[in-house]
Swiss-Prot record:
The keyword Transport does not apply. NCBIfam families: murD. Cell wall formation. Catalyzes the addition of glutamate to the nucleotide precursor UDP-N-acetylmuramoyl-L-alanine (UMA). It comes from Vibrio vulnificus (strain CMCP6). Its EC number is 6.3.2.9. InterPro entries: Mur-like_cat_sf, Mur_ligase_C, Mur_ligase_C_dom_sf, Mur_ligase_cen, MurD. Belongs to the MurCDEF family. ATP binds at residues 115-121. This is UDP-N-acetylmuramoylalanine--D-glutamate ligase.
Length: 442
């Protein structure tokens, strides 16, 4: 079936990295189409890279262009509930995202991962281990390279990280294996409630052959009403079932059906949440028919991703930890649960809170030798959580204030539990700035 048969005019909504990848893909694969780009920002990122013959409208919506479109490709950051998008849908015109276009074009097996936390680490490590097992693999989606740009690479397997936003506009993605890692409160400024958010995540199983779900979080299990009778479920968790954890030779081991795979202490990744992440990777590789035993040496040497519990400076016995990727409550909870700090923990929290409730942090913080440093637009929301809480405007102000107090055994950790958009372009920019400050003051 030729999906493009009746499509002549395409409007791409939102430029940036994703929008540019859509324009490049359409230009290369469907040169007959008339492509126009709308971005409501006055100077959108990537505007200088847009080919000069592509019509561009910035600073507002262009209702006339949307009214003429046969297909609208929207950025995942734009909610389907947006009135202009609703008007397009009411006309019976399809509104898709870049992942749906990828699904139309991909001709190799695809593994995809979603969840509130851990999906970037799982995606990256799945790709690293697949390559180590001799399967040429490309990694992207919501992490690093846009999905459509992966189609340029000669590979045998694609591994995609998918956000709930991306899944909302995806309906044709056939997966050899799909994982739903966990569900915790996030993006409540976008969704009507937790069930709304969960339903978006569950879309990952729509055309999946195997589904990897979390025994410790039943919310990750698909509902039978979804009509996915052909979906074969594989589970992971902290007990000894399927992909799990056993006691073997007096210590904790990762296991499959109670057979030992690897001692937990052999992992370079820190924290219990990362043991779960590794179990998911082993499950996904198994579902894709890849013998993970060939990649265990790569697993043992894997140190994780930048901005995720990453030690960026270690001087005079003081550790500086960049966990800028902790853009929600559960990420920060996970980081704190796996923590080993001999002295005082200086914890930097705050930013754009996305309407979340941070009170569940209070009992965790109460157990720590802590100085809570609250900054950014929603820093005030953290002030009632600990007696030590101090308010700052910017991250720089925090570091300047605490640096004279630091002693050997202390840890300075950025794990903000918030998005970065109040003061930074993204979580990477925030983490890079923290790393700069760490090197300066360490």
């Amino acid at each position: 079936m030729d999906r493009w048969q009746d499509i002549k005019q395409v409007v791409v909504v939102g430029l940036g990295i994703t929008g540019l990848s859509v324009v490049r893909h359409l230009r290369k694969t469907q040169p007959q189409l008339q492509v126009k780009v709308i971005d409501t920002r006055p100077t959108p990122p990537g505007v200088e890279q847009l080919p000069p013959d592509i019509a561009l409208h910035v600073g507002s919506w262009n209702d006339a262009w949307l009214a003429e479109a046969d297909l609208v490709v929207t950025n995942p950051g734009i909610a389907l509930a947006t009135p202009q998008i609703q008007t397009v849908l009411a006309r019976g015109v399809a509104v898709v995202g870049d992942i749906e276009l990828f699904a139309w074009a991909a001709d190799k097996p695809v593994i995809a991962i979603t969840g509130s936390n851990g999906k970037s680490t799982v995606t990256d490590l799945t790709g690293v281990m697949a390559n180590a097992c001799g399967v040429k693999c490309a990694i992207g989606g919501n992490i690093g390279v846009p999905a459509l740009d992966l189609l340029e690479q000669e590979v045998e397997l694609y591994v995609l990280e998918l956000s709930s936003f991306q899944l909302e506009t995806t309906s044709s993605l056939h997966l050899v294996a799909a994982a739903f890692l966990n569900l915790s409160e996030d993006h409540m400024d976008r969704y009507q409630g937790m069930d709304d958010y969960r339903q978006a995540k569950l879309r990952i199983f729509q055309h999946a052959k195997h589904g990897v779900v979390n025994r410790d979080d039943r919310q990750t299990y698909p509902e039978t009403s979804h009509g996915q009778q052909s979906l074969a479920l594989v589970t992971f968790g902290s007990d000894d079932k399927e992909f799990g954890v056993i006691s073997h030779q007096g210590e904790s081991w990762l296991s499959y059906n109670q057979q030992p795979i690897l001692a937990s202490r052999e992992l370079k990744l820190v924290g219990q949440h990362n043991v779960a992440n590794v179990l998911v990777v082993l499950a996904l590789l198994t579902c894709a028919g890849i013998d993970y035993r060939k990649g265990l040496s790569a697993l043992k040497s894997y140190t994780g991703l930048t901005h995720r519990c990453q030690v960026v400076a270690d001087n005079r016995g003081i550790k500086w930890v960049n966990d800028s990727k902790a853009t929600n409550l559960a990420s920060t909870q996970a980081a704190l649960s796996g923590l080993n700090c001999a002295g005082k923990l200086y914890l930097l929290v705050g930013g754009d809170g996305k309407g979340a409730d941070f009170s569940p942090l209070k009992p965790i913080l109460a157990q720590l030798n802590l100085q809570l440093c609250c900054f950014g637009a929603d820093g005030d929301q953290f002030m009632p959580l600990h007696a030590s809480a101090t308010r700052f405007e910017r991250m720089e102000d925090v570091i300047e204030h605490i640096s004279p107090q630091l002693q050997s055994g202390d840890m300075v950790m950025l794990s903000p539990a918030c998005a970065s958009f109040d003061q930074f372009s993204n979580f990477m920019a925030r983490g890079d700035r923290f790393a700069e400050l760490a090197r300066q003051y360490a």
